Curated annotation (Swiss-Prot):
Belongs to the lysopine/nopaline/octopine/opine/vitopine dehydrogenases family. It catalyses: D-nopaline + NADP(+) + H2O = L-arginine + 2-oxoglutarate + NADPH + H(+). Gene3D superfamilies: N-(1-d-carboxylethyl)-l-norvaline Dehydrogenase, domain 2 (1.10.1040.10), NAD(P)-binding Rossmann-like Domain (3.40.50.720). Its EC number is 1.5.1.19. Pfam families: NAD_Gly3P_dh_N (PF01210), Octopine_DH (PF02317). It is an enzyme of class 1 (oxidoreductase). GO terms for molecular function: D-nopaline dehydrogenase activity; NAD binding; oxidoreductase activity, acting on the CH-OH group of donors, NAD or NADP as acceptor. This is D-nopaline dehydrogenase.
Length: 413
């Protein structure tokens, strides 16, 4: 099946604005995938959108709406993409493929793509967010190059999946991007290949910072998301059918006596108070200590937040209370399967696995890993990380961008 890629704002733009000679296939139609597809279309980049049959995102609605996505916020108006069921057709028609999905379901996307390895050798893939995609999957997939963003370039939320509406709250001022195989300039500095720089300039308006693939694993979302989620875990409703009849009756009585707040809960503004921010900063210290053991110098959690949005918040609590972009909607976990307890768990376990290679202890990080597993009722009796990086050696880490791997006894505080 051949597909005709379209990328038009409606009504059609002025005649002197010609489409760019670039075609993109977005794989994943959740909040960020839908928003990025519309963003690329707004920049006149022909865009196809694909998702697996069981994907909970918006692709069915987009197909029913003839490929039209309506946006509000940073860009406004309807934009048309080509929603497609045929992954092979998307691969053949796209110069660049962009995976936009949770890290804890990367396996299923990789399994789908591996069926087309013969056609991937000339393709570049961008993974948003990467979470160590190249480290984990480069041997299973035969892409020309694997690029990974350290964070999503876009902050967005599907506001009405039935009508394909998405609120694009912010475009990041900057984000990190890695390339594997690692490319270096004439001076030996890690850089993006020259033939890709114009492509990324067409796709994104942000300042792109080239980083090694290993550094992608250390991005701080696992702290800003998982820590407040765990520390507010008591807000979650009990799982369906988990209560006895008597317990259900008593819960109803409690709700009648003191009804739960009708208004929503602002995850950042209300869920990350000063005490929670203190915990985040301590776990951030552990994160940066492990990165330093690999020769990677990371900015603090607060500095990363300010760099992303080009802001000057003085404290992490101030950042969490800012009206936009994180307190626009009541976006908060409602069960233990939410990505803050799943995707970010993968990242915490990856950092812990690297720490084990460097023989560094992470008491707080391990505590949060164990609490998430315990909350899911799946505590690992061996205490061993499920991260594939647990099987790596120091030389493996160096292959993906570590300059060295110090043992903790060699490190100077």
């Amino acid at each position: 099946m051949a597909i005709t890629l379209s990328a038009t704002s409606l009504p059609i733009s002025a005649a002197d604005h010609h489409p760019l000679p670039l075609t993109v296939g977005v794989l994943g139609s959740g909040h960020a995938g839908t928003a990025l597809a519309a963003w690329f279309a707004s920049r006149h980049v022909p865009t196809a959108l694909w998702a697996p049959a069981d994907h909970p995102g918006s692709i069915s609605a987009i197909k029913a709406n003839e490929g039209v996505i309506t946006t509000e916020g940073m860009i406004n108006g309807p934009f048309r993409v080509s929603a497609c069921d045929d992954l092979a057709a998307v691969i053949r028609s796209s110069r660049v493929l962009i995976i936009v999905t949770r890290a804890d379901v990367h396996d299923s996307f990789v399994n789908e793509l591996a069926n087309f390895n013969g056609e991937l050798a000339t393709k570049d893939i961008v993974v948003v967010c990467g979470h160590g995609f190249s480290i984990k999957y480069e041997r299973q997939l035969r892409f020309k190059r694997i690029f990974e963003t350290d964070n999503s370039p876009i902050t967005s939320k599907l506001s009405d999946q039935k009508k394909c509406n998405v609120n694009i709250k912010e475009m990041k001022a900057s984000f990190g991007l890695s390339c594997f195989p690692i490319h270096r300039d004439d001076a030996g500095v890690i850089d993006l290949p020259e033939d890709t720089k114009n492509i990324f300039a067409q796709l994104f308006s942000a300042r792109i910072i080239c980083i090694p693939p290993l550094q992608v694993l250390f991005f701080s979302n696992c702290i800003t998301h998982a820590v407040p989620a765990v520390m507010n875990i008591g807000r979650l409703r009990d799982p369906a059918n988990s209560l006895t009849k008597r317990a259900e009756k008593w819960l109803l009585e409690l709700d009648e006596r003191t009804p739960r707040a009708e208004k929503g809960f602002f995850f950042y503004g209300e869920g990350s108070n000063t005490y929670v921010c203190n915990v985040q900063e301590q776990i951030d210290h552990e994160r940066r200590k492990v990165a330093a053991a690999c020769g990677l110098r990371l900015n603090s959690l607060l500095q990363e937040c300010n760099d992303e949005y080009d802001t000057d918040y003085e404290t992490l609590r101030e950042y969490c209370l800012a009206p936009s972009p994180h307190n626009v909607h009541h976006a908060c976990p409602d069960n233990m399967e939410h990505r803050y307890f799943s995707e970010e768990l993968c990242s915490l376990e990856d950092v812990a696995a690297i720490a084990a290679i460097a023989n560094i202890e992470l008491p707080l990080t391990h505590a949060f890993i164990n609490i998430i597993h315990a909350g899911k009722g799946k505590i690992n009796p061996t205490g061993k990380s499920s991260s594939v990086i647990g099987n790596f050696s120091s030389s493996d880490l160096i292959r993906f961008g570590a300059t060295h791997v110090f043992n903790k006894d060699e490190m100077v505080e």
